[in-house]
Amino acid sequence: MQGLGKKVLSVLVFVAAFVVVKYGFDAYQRYKTQANVEASMAKLKADGVKNNPNLPVSEAMGREAVAKTSEQLSAEGDEKTRRARAASSYFGFYLVNTRTRPEFCRQQNVDITPFVSAFEREHKAESAQARAALAAVDTDENQLFGLVEKQLKQVIVQDMNDIAASNKVSVREACQMIASNGETVAAEMHISKVQPAVYRTLTTGRP
């Protein structure tokens, strides 16, 4: 089970949503326009594919997301804003796995509740910290989710197709793999392991 969980995790690249919601946060603060979110998402995809041409699209986007998020957190001088950026990145990671992915798999007639429940337990403390950081700038995860829900659905379609192709299974079987190994996958993908910079900023305020 451990090996399978790692194999799934290597392709899932849940971090693709980090910058989607980080960009969503910026767009909401600056322009409050859906068009800006879509343009940012398109750039993330283009840059990811350009810089990682031999990787599946979702994994290329994930690597680009991690790099950009780390750079932007390091460049932010104001701690409150830095925490809010980290929180928005965190909730991209969190919501794509607790809302968008379960919805996708339900459409495949697969219930991944075991994974979702384990994921929520693993991130209870971080979710509380992220909510506090967003509250400090007068927003919350539901506002962020509403802004980028369309983009998260696009990320999931690409992501799940990549999982299926990598493991030589159908998309429905990919959902079943996640459900069957929910505890293992959730434990392996704690925010501190997947995106240390976001975790560090959430918990200490430092980039």
Annotate each predicted stretch with a short phrase.
Residues 6-9, 105-108, 173-175:
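Functionally engaged cysteine thiol sites
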Residues 7, 26-30, 203:
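The feature captures two recurrent sequence modes
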Residues 9-22:
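Hydrophobic membrane-insertion alpha-helices, especially the h-region
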Residues 30-114:
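Immediate post-signal-peptide N-terminus of mature secreted/exported proteins
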Residues 1-5:
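Short, Lys/Arg-rich N-terminal segment immediately upstream of the first membrane anchor
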Residues 29, 33-37, 45, 152, ...:
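Hydrophobic face of amphipathic alpha-helices
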Residues 58-65, 73-77, 116-207:
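Compact alpha-helical subdomains of small soluble proteins
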